[in-house]
Amino acid sequence: MLDTVALSPEIDALMNDIGRKAKAAARPLSFASTEVKNRALNAMADAILANKAEILAENAKDLKDTEGSEMLASFVDRLTLNDKRVAEMAEGIRAIAALADPVGEVIAAWDRPNGLKIERVRTPLGVIGVIFESRPNVTADAGALCLKAGNAVILRCGSDSRRSSQAIHACLVEGLKAAGLPEHAIQLVPVTDRAAVGAMLRGLDGAVDVIVPRGGKSLVARVQSEARVPVFAHLEGLCHIYVDGSADIEMAMQIVVNAKMRRTGICGAAETLLVDGAAIGTHLTPLLEVLTSAGCEVRASPTVLKVAPGLKPATEEDWSTEYLDAIISVAVVDGISGAIAHIQKYSSNHTEAVIAEDPDVVARFFTEVDSAILLHNASTQFADGGEFGMGAEIGIATGKMHARGPVGVEQLTSFKYRVHGAGQTRP
């Protein structure tokens, strides 16, 4: 938990120095060639694989610190690294290297009647601050994405993932040096003092351009409340699935179980299942059975309890709860209109899915539901930058300014205008 703390002059001095170094590194990064950036990224991936044993050893120490604590299983799962996850981390960095470089891309171009030729061109944001808790893989993902987009990044991990993040960060610095890029392009805050978070939120004397929080609701809420710089964030997942009467029941069963149970502790996990009232007799019971058979606790609305009286009744609080666990709330709704109304009332605007074969139902869902990610006949667990072909993501944003949905390399850029003339003067 990252609570508000008093100002610390020593921490402020340390953090402002980190900010100055990041800002200095951001300039050469902003015009570094694609070849050089990709060389650094591939060297980072090589270093992570070469140092896998050390990374896992440091992660084991972090995990040992959670023993005897009251950490949720989902928290420990996010903290845990293994051979597969380390390999995926390296693969993710290589995937980012393989992406098109957004910097310098001409987004739009047009000619004016007076002969001026105008181009809108992607540019780096500058310095990005990433504050995260139990996900050591964020060190690699955020560092690589920011580098690809020509940005410097300041990473502040939680004390729970400190050792793992330090081991991964050392590999990133090794990659920067191998490509001749400034080592301060990717910095990891060396202290766990919570005052460091406050300093980042104040912008480090103008060094930080954007803050991205990755963590629990309390962290994100604090960042959104206190930050004096723009924030890319979502407060919670709270994803919904609506199963329409037109849905293929076998498909719906597979999708619902995957959306809830594949990984229960991620923000793309489904937390509420809505079933069309017209399909109670055909769809509700099979969906409940497949969920309970998978080990999921179901919290049921009164209408659902009439069909399955042995389930736990849902409270009003359940409809606005992100469980991050093997628990799901289930309600029967009055068709697509009822589903949209429920989602509009309780959604966090993160991700929602509709399972339906009726194109009119799908069209209404896509038009009227105002969440960052909408899926048709697919699991909510696809709400991920890697699955979107972005290589990875630095986070998922649910706001409507600048970035929305998975924040990948393109979303980590701004733009400028280039105007070519031939001696024009304004009358």
UniProtKB/Swiss-Prot annotation:
GO BP: L-proline biosynthetic process
Keyword RNA-binding applies: no
Keywords attached to this entry: Amino-acid biosynthesis, Cytoplasm, NADP, Oxidoreductase, Proline biosynthesis
Main location: cytoplasm
PROSITE patterns linked: PROA
Keyword Endoplasmic reticulum: no
Pathway participation: Amino-acid biosynthesis; L-proline biosynthesis; L-glutamate 5-semialdehyde from L-glutamate: step 2/2
Localization in the cell: Cytoplasm
GO CC field: cytoplasm
Database matches in Gene3D superfamilies: Aldehyde Dehydrogenase, Chain A, domain 1 (3.40.605.10), Aldehyde Dehydrogenase, Chain A, domain 2 (3.40.309.10)
Signal peptide: none
EC main group: oxidoreductase
Recorded catalytic activity of this chain's protein: L-glutamate 5-semialdehyde + phosphate + NADP(+) = L-glutamyl 5-phosphate + NADPH + H(+)
Family designation: Belongs to the gamma-glutamyl phosphate reductase family.
Purpose of the protein: Catalyzes the NADPH-dependent reduction of L-glutamate 5-phosphate into L-glutamate 5-semialdehyde and phosphate. The product spontaneously undergoes cyclization to form 1-pyrroline-5-carboxylate.
Xref: PANTHER family: DELTA-1-PYRROLINE-5-CARBOXYLATE SYNTHASE, GLUTAMATE SEMIALDEHYDE DEHYDROGENASE
Name under which the protein is recorded: Gamma-glutamyl phosphate reductase
Lineage of the species this protein comes from: Bacteria, Pseudomonadati, Pseudomonadota, Alphaproteobacteria, Hyphomicrobiales
